[in-house]
Amino acid sequence: MFRGATLVNLDSKGRLSVPTRYREQLLENAAGQMVCTIDIHHPCLLLYPLPEWEIIEQKLSRLSSTNPVERRVQRLLLGHASECQMDGAGRLLIAPVLRQHAGLTKEVMLVGQFNKFELWDETTWHQQVKEDIDAEQLATGDLSERLQDLSL
């Protein structure tokens, strides 16, 4: 399980260094093999260990290629999916087209989200967090049943 937000830097070749606390788990569970794709709702990337991505692919394969909405989701997620292998120094090379989609340049937020990571431009991440907090403060109590059961 991945959790927390960590600031990492992209080097001049577009590689990011995976924080040490995740490396062993990624090597053990995925042999360092990852898949990166775009998030279709936010200006960030989704980074999955290969076994987790394969579950997503199975779900995508069950969508209808004749339904325009389902086909669009398949096209966006699969069409942008890029395999990346963690190197011996614990770095992942993020494809240029993916970096461009998320506006990633130097400072990147690696955000744990249970079975995957989100990759955000640092400034965009902080703006999104502020927007999310503001939206929660303005919320009128329209919580889903699952959120109503969440006690913090």
Curated annotation (Swiss-Prot):
Localization per Swiss-Prot or TrEMBL: Cytoplasm, Nucleoid
A Pfam family recorded for this sequence: MraZ
Family: Belongs to the MraZ family.
Keyword Cytoplasm included in the entry's annotation: yes
Name of the protein: Transcriptional regulator MraZ
Any single GO CC term annotated in Swiss-Prot or TrEMBL for this entry: nucleoid
Primary localization class, coarse: cytoplasm
Subunit text: Forms oligomers.
Coiled coil, from the record: none
Protein's job: Negatively regulates its own expression and that of the subsequent genes in the proximal part of the division and cell wall (dcw) gene cluster. Acts by binding directly to DNA. May also regulate the expression of genes outside the dcw cluster.
GO terms of molecular function: DNA-binding transcription factor activity; transcription cis-regulatory region binding
Assigned keywords, A-Z: Cytoplasm, DNA-binding, Repeat, Repressor, Transcription, Transcription regulation
Organism per entry: Escherichia coli O127:H6 (strain E2348/69 / EPEC)
InterPro entries xref list: MraZ (IPR003444), MraZ_C (IPR035644), MraZ_dom (IPR020603), MraZ_N (IPR035642), MraZ_sf (IPR038619), SpoVT-AbrB_dom (IPR007159), SpoVT-AbrB_sf (IPR037914)
Gene Ontology BP, a term: negative regulation of DNA-templated transcription initiation
Stretches assigned to the SpoVT-AbrB domain: 5-52, 81-124
